[in-house]
C-alpha cells in the first residue's frame, strides 16, 4: 500500500526515533509499504519517520539511481536497515546536491564524509556490519539523519536557510505540488 509521505513541519520528522524488536506490530507490512511508497515517489531512500512512524528503520535502493556517477561502477544496494548505528564516518568530505521526499522541490549542497561503517539488523533481524562508500554512504547518512530527527536542510548555510524560509512555510501548509501523496502539518 502506498502511504503518504510526511512533509516538512510534521513533528515526527524532528523526533529521535525509537529502537524496535522483532515483535513490532506488522513490521514486514510496514517495510513492504515503505518500498511501494518510495518507488511511487521516485525516491532512493525512505525512513520510517517519513511515513509517520518514529522507529529506527529505513530502506535504501541505489540500484535504480538514474544519474549515478560514471566513475562509480557499482551495482548499488537495496537494503533494509533496522536499529542502525553509524559506527564511523570517514574518508574525504564531499559536497553533493541532496533532496528529500519530505521537502519537495528543495535541493541543497550538503557535505558528508565519503565512507560510513554501520551496524544494523536486516529485515530478518540478522545482525550486520558493513562499510559503504560513495552514493551508498551518502544516502545511508541522509536516511540515518531522519531517524535521528534531522533533515538535510539543517546542513545548509545560514544564507540558504533564509532564502528557503518562505518555500518551507508553504510546504508546511501544503502549498506545494508533487507527484506523490503527502501529509502536511497545517491544513
Language-model regions, residue ranges each:
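Positively charged
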Residues: 1-187
Amino acid at each position: 500500500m502506498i502511504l503518504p509521505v510526511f512533509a516538512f513541519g510534521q513533528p515526527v520528522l524532528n523526533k529521535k526515533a525509537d529502537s524496535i524488536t522483532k515483535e513490532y506490530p506488522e513490521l514486514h507490512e510496514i517495510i513492504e509499504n515503505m518500498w511501494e511508497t518510495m518507488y511511487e515517489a521516485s525516491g532512493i531512500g525512505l525512513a520510517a519517520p517519513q511515513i509517520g512512524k518514529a522507529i529506527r528503520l529505513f530502506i535504501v535502493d541505489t540500484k535504480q539511481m538514474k544519474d549515478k556517477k560514471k566513475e562509480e561502477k557499482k551495482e548499488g544496494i537495496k537494503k533494509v536497515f533496522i536499529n542502525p548505528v553509524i559506527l564511523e564516518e570517514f574518508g574525504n568530505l564531499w559536497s553533493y546536491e541532496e533532496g528529500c521526499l519530505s521537502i519537495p522541490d528543495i535541493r541543497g549542497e550538503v557535505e558528508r564524509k565519503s565512507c560510513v561503517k554501520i551496524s544494523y539488523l536486516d529485515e530478518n533481524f540478522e545482525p550486520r556490519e558493513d562499510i559503504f562508500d560513495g552514493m551508498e554512504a551518502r544516502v545511508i547518512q541522509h536516511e540515518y539523519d531522519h531517524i535521528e530527527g534531522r533533515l538535510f536542510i539543517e546542513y545548509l548555510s545560514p544564507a540558504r536557510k533564509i532564502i528557503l524560509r518562505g518555500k518551507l512555510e508553504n510546504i508546511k501548509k501544503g502549498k506545494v505540488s508533487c507527484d506523490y501523496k503527502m501529509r502536511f502539518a497545517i491544513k
